[in-house]
A protein has these predicted regions:
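Short secondary-structure boundary/capping segments
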Residues: 1, 16-17, 61-62, 69, ...
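N-terminal subdomain of lithium-sensitive/metallo-dependent phosphomonoesterases centered on the IMPase/IPPase/PAP
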Residues: 1-30, 170, 192-199, 206
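Conserved residues at the C-terminal ends of beta-strands
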Residues: 12, 62, 150
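Acidic active-site catalytic centers that drive phospho-/nucleotidyl reactions
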Residues: 12-13, 28-31, 35, 145, ...
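DPxDG-like acidic metal-binding loop motif
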Residues: 19-78
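Short loop segments at secondary-structure junctions
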Residues: 50-54, 65, 74-76, 82-83, ...
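Short hydrophobic/aromatic-rich beta-strand segments that constitute the beta-sheet cores
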Residues: 59, 77-82, 103, 146
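An extended, acidic
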Residues: 89-206
Length: 206
């Protein structure tokens, strides 16, 4: 705030502080509250920077228990740990049948959304739940290939999109339009996986 006093700030805990620069910092101090309460090290702190068009440009996904900080920006993504910082990239998986996919909790989806997810679950090789924003970090790190979620708030998503894209992944809504922070979001390691997933997801797109 001292270095960028004209920027807006939006957070889950703070609401919106207006700015005049056209830039908005979007903050979520603890994403994955249930994991935090349970003592599971998959909760994260999220910091996103959104431009005046509503596009997420820079993102940070920080997991202090594991000492992992994922940083995404136009043209690159990095993982910072105690041993230093190094570039990261998505996996080379191009087939949903070979993919590791994730969502936080399918039971918070609408019934049509659950139907779309069920088709993805039946097709993918491995399915994981309950990772919240950390699942998107692991797309960037190359161990998860697709995440699909719905009902996201801006503070849930603004940090995630730049990290995935910076690592070479893709992010869009369930119609296949370029992702904006919030709502329905699908991120994938490759165009092949994304195209296969959208066949199902478009049926329940908002």
């Amino acid at each position: 705030a001292d270095l960028r006093p004209d920027d807006a700030i939006q957070g889950e805990e703070y609401g919106l502080k207006d700015g005049t620069s056209g830039w908005t910092w979007v903050l979520d101090p603890i994403d994955g509250t249930r994991a935090f309460v349970a003592g599971l090290p998959v909760w994260t702190t999220l910091i996103g920077l959104v431009d005046d068009k509503g596009d997420a440009i820079v993102g940070i996904i920080d997991q202090p228990v594991l000492d992992e900080r994922y940083i995404g920006y136009p043209g690159g993504a990095e993982l910072e740990t105690a041993s230093g910082r190094h570039p990261i990239s998505v996996s080379n998986c191009d087939d949903l049948r070979e993919a590791v996919i994730a969502t936080t909790d399918p039971f918070i989806m609408t019934m049509p959304e659950q139907g779309a997810w069920s088709h993805l679950r039946a097709t993918a090789r491995i399915v994981r739940y309950g990772l919240d924003a950390y699942a998107y970090a692991r797309i960037a790190g190359g161990t998860i290939d697709l995440v699909a979620e719905s009902g996201l708030a801006p503070y849930d998503a603004a940090a995630l999109i730049p990290v995935v894209r910076g690592a070479g992944g893709l992010a869009c809504d369930w119609r296949g339009n370029p992702a904006k922070p919030g709502g329905q979001l699908v991120c994938a390691a490759s165009q092949g996986i994304l195209d296969q997933a959208l066949i199902s997801l478009r049926r329940s797109a908002e």
